[in-house]
């Protein structure tokens, strides 16, 4: 009986720490992704290249995922790394944006499935490009068109609420 109480107390104390570590990892991934999105929105291929390198460094499996979460992460991690690596190796912004499109779709599926984002994430859509991206704010900053006339082209189509 004493052993069960000890195990229960350990689980109560350790589980929140494990969740916090996993959420910190997800926050690192989303923060790096948003840096990449913002670099593309400014039209800087060089900045996007550097931001993709930061994202590549952040792309690692969060600790303590349950079996369903691990399956989701495993389904998408190679795709996320492929697009991120490609963006980090080229400076042509149009080519970067092509890979950013699939990167965004795949990261959305990961975040939606893991339910570990501690900040609200917005999924935005550009009708001109027919492409989606994720944003940290509800304000539209279009990463597919950086010229002033198209910088705010788009609309929010989904919201992933913050998980506390």
Regions found by a protein language model. Give the residues of each.
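Bacterial Sec-dependent N-terminal signal peptides
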Residues: 1-25
